[in-house]
C-alpha cells in the first residue's frame, strides 16, 4: 500500500478544517497509509528584512526536511510549480507506483515560502493555481485531490 506523508508548516486551528481533514483521512485509509506532520512555524514580526525572511525559511526548511528519507519522492506545493488536471495528477501518482515509489511526501511551506534547500530536494513542484490559498486550507484541498486521484485510478465514480 502506498505511503503518503504530508509535511506542513504551522498548526491548524480552525475546527471546520480539522473536521474536513479527518473526513478525507478516513476516506483515504482504504487506498493509502497516510501520515501528517505539522512543523512549528518560526515566529516572525510583520516586517522582516530580506535576510531575516531567508533565515526564517531556512529554519523552517531544516525542520521540513528532517524526517524525509532519501528514497521518498517529494512533491512541493509551490506557486511556481506546474499545474495538473485531476486526471493528470491521478496518472502521475499511478506512474510513481509503476516506478516502484512506495513513499510520496508532499511539502506545504510556511507563509514566506520555502528555502532553496527544500526546493532542491523536491522531485516535483506542483501548483494548484496561481492564486494564493491559506496554508491550512491547502492541506484539506490536497487531501481531497489525493482522494480524487485514488478514485480515478481505481475507476471508481467521483463527481467532476
Curated annotation (Swiss-Prot):
The gene is rlmH. CDD domains: RlmH-like. HAMAP family: 23SrRNA_methyltr_H. PANTHER family: METHYLTRANSFERASE, RIBOSOMAL RNA LARGE SUBUNIT METHYLTRANSFERASE H. Keywords: Cytoplasm, Methyltransferase, rRNA processing, S-adenosyl-L-methionine, Transferase. This is Ribosomal RNA large subunit methyltransferase H. Coiled coil: none annotated. It comes from Desulfitobacterium hafniense (strain DSM 10664 / DCB-2). It holds the Pfam family SPOUT_MTase.
Amino acid at each position: 500500500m502506498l505511503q503518503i506523508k504530508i509535511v506542513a508548516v504551522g498548526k491548524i486551528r480552525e475546527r471546520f478544517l480539522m473536521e474536513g481533514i479527518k473526513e478525507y483521512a478516513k476516506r483515504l485509509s482504504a487506498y493509502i497509509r497516510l501520515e501528517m506532520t505539522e512543523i512549528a512555524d518560526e515566529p516572525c514580526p510583520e516586517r522582516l528584512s530580506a535576510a531575516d525572511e531567508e533565515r526564517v525559511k531556512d529554519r523552517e526548511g531544516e525542520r521540513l526536511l528532517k524526517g524525509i528519507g532519501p528514497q521518498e519522492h517529494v512533491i512541493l506545493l509551490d506557486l511556481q510549480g506546474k499545474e495538473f488536471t485531476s486526471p493528470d495528477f491521478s496518472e502521475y501518482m499511478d506512474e510513481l507506483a509503476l516506478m516502484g515509489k512506495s513513499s510520496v511526501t508532499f511539502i506545504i511551506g510556511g507563509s514566506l515560502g520555502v528555502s532553496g534547500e527544500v526546493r532542491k530536494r523536491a522531485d516535483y513542484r506542483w501548483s494548484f493555481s496561481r492564486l494564493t490559498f491559506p496554508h491550512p486550507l491547502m492541506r484539506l484541498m490536497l487531501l481531497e485531490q489525493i482522494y480524487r486521484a485514488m478514485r480515478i485510478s481505481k475507476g471508481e465514480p467521483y463527481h467532476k
